[in-house]
Amino acid sequence: MSDTSTNTGRYQATFAKLKTEGRGAFVPFVTLGDPSPVLSLKIIDTLVQNGADALELGFPFSDPLADGPVIQGANLRSLAAGTTPTACFELLAQVRAKYPELPIGLLLYANLVFANGIDAFYAKAQQAGVDSVLIADVPVEESAPFSEAAKAHGIAPIFIAPPNADSETLALVSASGEGYTYLLSRAGVTGTDTKAGVPVEEILSKLKTFNAPPPLLGFGIAEPAQVTAAIKAGAAGAISGSAVVKIIETHQHDEAKLLAALGDFTRAMKAAT
């Protein structure tokens, strides 16, 4: 028996449960090891205990092309704290042991996967209990070697549906992806300063036509109203990265304040689903 069913199974079970509740998913993103490996685990606990439906986690990387200054700051703090890929896999295994039902996704860059060897990376991810991997700088057209390794290890390959994608690309994303579809609300770098407008109904209806995995809207999701709007437009939920990481940046030297602020933010975002 392969593990494939169990891994996308966590996403399917989560989306099915949310559907019966008439709600969408709130999925926060953080960089593993930011601001330190020990505090990173407490941050993840806080997110999950305050309503996160799934997690999107990054490995620290010093040259993130798609990331704005906030996420770059997270990468640099994590690297400065000595977070290695091995430490990331150890953190992931701890999170998985604590939350057996929780979908855990990785969002990272191809260099990190190549550095390990593609197959070895996915094998380690599987051992740590990871459900999905999205490689931000590999478009679906070039993804075959990664997807094959992912599927061989029971991990869902996740693809980005860009806001300017044509039908052909959306069809390919829909056919190639498993778990969920990462829907960009706008092109550009991640960040919260530009509001995520949601003229995404058209893309959402195309994805539905192509029977894509459930779409989660990401990029620029920083307040509850945007979560509500995304779900109203037909998304299965929303991913928020920079807004979460901004809280870590602001309170990185005051653990109590940091965890309290993250708890408040997560509850407010989840309430909007």
UniProtKB/Swiss-Prot annotation:
Gene Ontology molecular function terms on file: tryptophan synthase activity
Sequence similarity: Belongs to the TrpA family.
Designated name of the protein: Tryptophan synthase alpha chain
Name of the gene: trpA
Enzyme class at the top of the EC tree: lyase
PROSITE patterns associated with the record: TRP_SYNTHASE_ALPHA
Listed pathway(s): Amino-acid biosynthesis; L-tryptophan biosynthesis; L-tryptophan from chorismate: step 5/5
Keywords: Amino-acid biosynthesis, Aromatic amino acid biosynthesis, Lyase, Tryptophan biosynthesis
Domain of life: Bacteria
Species of provenance: Shewanella baltica (strain OS195)
